[in-house]
């Protein structure tokens, strides 16, 4: 699952939040 945080940063959701560059 891929979502975006409030700043539009791509965040990978896989048990924990990780920033995806």
UniProtKB/Swiss-Prot annotation:
GO terms for cellular component: cell outer membrane; pore complex. Keywords: Cell outer membrane, Disulfide bond, Ion transport, Membrane, Porin, Transmembrane, Transmembrane beta strand, Transport. The keyword Transport applies. It comes from Actinobacillus suis. It is found in: Cell outer membrane. Structural rigidity of the outer membrane of elementary bodies and porin forming, permitting diffusion of solutes through the intracellular reticulate body membrane. One of its GO terms (molecular function) is porin activity. It is a multi-pass membrane protein. This is Major outer membrane protein. GO terms for biological process: monoatomic ion transport. It comes from the Bacteria. Disulfide bond interactions within and between MOMP molecules and other components form high molecular-weight oligomers.
